[in-house]
Amino acid sequence: MLGLGLTITFTVDWEVRLRTWGGRFLNRLVGEVLENAGVRIPHNGAKPYTISPILDPGGRIVNRLVPGTTYWFRASFMCNMIDCDGVVGAFVRDSYRLGSGEVVRVLRVRAREFRPSLNGGSSSNNNRSIIEWGVEYYPTVFPFARHYITHPSPARFLTSATKTLAQLLRNTEVTLDGGGELYNAIINNIDTRGFVKDLVLNTEIVGFRVRRLRVGLGGGRVMPAFYGTAEYVTVTENISLFNALLNVAEFFGVGKNRALGLGFVRVTHRVVRNEDSAVETIRGPTALGN
């Protein structure tokens, strides 16, 4: 098993006001639940999990927990960095009691295994295909060259997803250099580094609606971020690996501070078209207007 996702539905016995970003509350909850169950997690370096924000049944982010109301969040774990069997045992229980005395009442825990499908590594007819796809972003920020990128950059999205896939397969076919960057990564005989470069060159954003915000992380720390939706178009011969990257992004998130609930995304659609037929459609009758 490469990855494990737990979707946890819960409620509380008394009101909890989240004075900072709710991902900090969830990060503390996940860490304490694991440690109380004897599941060891590293305190320095990359965390073996990512989490979503706290959401209501309609998928809206909340900053206040009210008794009698249900909420949910998702935590995704990398099984080469943590004992995923132990994770299941830690979270499948009636309640979680935090060191601060707060009690979270668990209503339901749903587990899902992550298995990227890389079979074949290319489209069935070896033709280049056009993929139209969309993403709904919850608060997200991409790091790049000591800057924070607060718009839905396709290059940052695809690079982040590729690095996560490499991290998932770190002890198998993927090789990383000492700095943790992708270096000649091979998945099923595919040059992943070259693939993502080609993918970035052949992906364009065709529309987006986003808003920027500043996320308070506590202790005076503030992180710039954005949220909203974006539409992209990609041309590739390797549909299988491209789909695997979208699946990784949706399962583990993208960007920075994912263990604090940032970078949670939902792939809204993906439509695959044959490049030849798409060109024929584009060459059809057109009309110009104001």
Residue ranges and their predicted role:
Residues M1-N290:
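RNA-interacting cores
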